[in-house]
Amino acid sequence: MAALTWRRFMNINKDLKAAVNMNPTRNTRNLTVENLCNMIDGGTLTIPLYQRDVSWTKQKCVELLNYELLGKSPISAISVNVINNTDSDFAVPQVSFIDREVMPNMVRGQFSVVDGQQRLTTNYKAFCNNDDLRDIVLDLGSGKFVITTENIRGNQVPVGILMNRDSGKLISYVQSKRGMDNDVMAFLLLARTKILSYAYTVNMAEDLSEDEQITWFEVLNNAGSRVSIIQMRFAKMKAHGLDIYTQYTNI
């Protein structure tokens, strides 16, 4: 009788029922650094407006680049929200990488970064030879990326040349250096291929609301080092034409 009563009167929350039938960990892809940088170039990989600005130091960028080139285990996954519902009343406004310009249009299937902005920005800055990384070089003597404080030496290659979207930039650079022969050229092309083909696991969710994205963001990105609510609010002001970072933080 007790078992019959349980089956007849025990109610299970409908949201719980739906949750146990969904496994979000199955929705993943592997994308290379080059794939991801090309998506940023094409505007199909963007940043939600609530994300704070880039916070990594140059040394952190060097550590990432060295791990991608020399590391023996994969780096943690990048997490994105796939925007299928592009209705302006639902979709969170997006900004571009580096300059954080508000994107006027969204396309169905666009990737919005929830976790991984710092890593993606570092790789993209190298891909487009951004001035921020001009003094980061691959030092062939020490066998790693370093920050140079003097003129670039003959056995060093700027990361923005090595990882440049145009492979011809690397070839021209090597040909201009008297001490670099064909063997060095072959090695550098191999190193370039290694780092641009480095694959990240990309975890994907679809059409998360802003609140759901922020919850995911906080779980992934703020554990142990919370980003303040005011930082998120400052970031969101960009949608209304007020860029708090460029207008006030450099005074």
Task: Please report, for each region that a protein language model flagged, where it lies by residue.
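Intrinsically disordered, low-structural-confidence terminal and linker regions
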Residues: 1-17
